[in-house]
């Protein structure tokens, strides 16, 4: 057997010859696929064996698509745009890229589509700082820290009983036309004070993702934000109802990518998904057209993962990563107040709490129509300032007892004094929690209102006059006391501040007139008696004596 010898000079000569004759263009083989079938926003393509999952593909007419189904012989592609010109036999090429959107400060104040392109007619977006992939891994356990900084919504019913913290995922759920979007918009407007402070630790950048909404609805939202001066720190990502299902599917991920860019820079972000029900329906339509096996309610098996991988990106990052945060307010629309349906239960299990809006309360003019009984925040008091935590501790149980007592009182004719007082105070607390749209309250004013309600300062005020009396008290405190400033700066509501607030309530009561023109009980004005009346009174007393 011949001995095997290795000659280094032969190996070196072979390598030198290969390098000298190497031509780069012959090394890269461009794959070209062919459309087999096309329709309903879905194309089946053959001939791209190296395509990646979620890779961007370019059709012959320039339209882009996402490779969602990688089968043995075909690729199922979701078309991102107009399907005209995508016919059987037309060519498809891979780009080697996954879907991404531009990110940066230039997006503040703009309205963009699901691909990050401006649609507000204000020209190109300036200040783009790069691109970020839509499908990006959420922060790991060790990259996060606990949620403990409050994110104020400006709504008394939420900030007092269902507090939201920076980095939390809080679901807003309810039937159509119950005020879900109004809560989200009020929360954005309430961040204006923080933005104007100029303090990066206080400022919150807001992203409103409109999924499958009417164009008129989004225009209305944009107009409300502009009127309130909130558009300068807000980005609207718009995937209207007229868009193909693919755009509604990717829009939440596009908004999340824009927000994550700021979060990893150590900034604070609020993102609103309005609403994820429509995203799930778009994903269901795509999956059925791609012939994926349907499951419960015809949704595909991975619809839970659709929302979990999106909402898990909301986090409060560790200090090592800059301490930024992204707070998520996903919105889910129910049918007939059924929270046990598939998508609502999925998102409830993913999020850190839910705000349930009841249509009966909304129709009874109790707005925001928050059902305190089944609404909860799993972060709880950790996301409240000390002042609010100290005054709101008994509010939720007081309202729960009021609801029980109210149901009992419908069938009971005689109630003892304690029960009647409980009913009277509960009615005033419910009135106190009413709030007009686009009129968020600063947290220090909320503290005064909640404290006054829970300590009986409104008990002698007629229910119909509670909000007017509250406004008078807050106006008095703004001009006659530094109580509000103390709460805002220290976050505490000490005994001295309570005494000053109690004095303000009493002072306002002296001059407050109810809607029927009367003074409050114990604060009536008595005019001096005329001389003849005094003489007559003396005669009457003398006769009795």
Swiss-Prot record:
The record marks 375 as: Required for activity. ATP binds at residues 174-181. Its main location: membrane. Its EC number is 7.1.2.2. GO terms for cellular component: plasma membrane; proton-transporting ATP synthase complex. It is an enzyme of class 7 (translocase). SUPFAM superfamilies: C-terminal domain of alpha and beta subunits of F1 ATP synthase, N-terminal domain of alpha and beta subunits of F1 ATP synthase, P-loop containing nucleoside triphosphate hydrolases. One of its GO terms (molecular function) is ADP binding. The keyword tRNA processing does not apply. It catalyses: ATP + H2O + 4 H(+)(in) = ADP + phosphate + 5 H(+)(out). It is a peripheral membrane protein. It is found in: Cell membrane. The keyword Transport applies. Gene3D superfamilies: 2.40.30.20, ATP synthase alpha/beta chain, C-terminal domain, P-loop containing nucleotide triphosphate hydrolases. Keywords: ATP synthesis, ATP-binding, Cell membrane, CF(1), Hydrogen ion transport, Ion transport, Membrane, Nucleotide-binding, Translocase, Transport. Produces ATP from ADP in the presence of a proton gradient across the membrane. The alpha chain is a regulatory subunit. F-type ATPases have 2 components, CF(1) - the catalytic core - and CF(0) - the membrane proton channel. CF(1) has five subunits: alpha(3), beta(3), gamma(1), delta(1), epsilon(1). CF(0) has three main subunits: a(1), b(2) and c(9-12). The alpha and beta chains form an alternating ring which encloses part of the gamma chain. CF(1) is attached to CF(0) by a central stalk formed by the gamma and epsilon chains, while a peripheral stalk is formed by the delta and b chains. HAMAP family: ATP_synth_alpha_bact. Belongs to the ATPase alpha/beta chains family. NCBIfam families: atpA, PRK13343.1. This is ATP synthase subunit alpha. The lineage of its organism: Bacteria, Bacillati, Actinomycetota, Actinomycetes, Propionibacteriales. The gene is atpA.
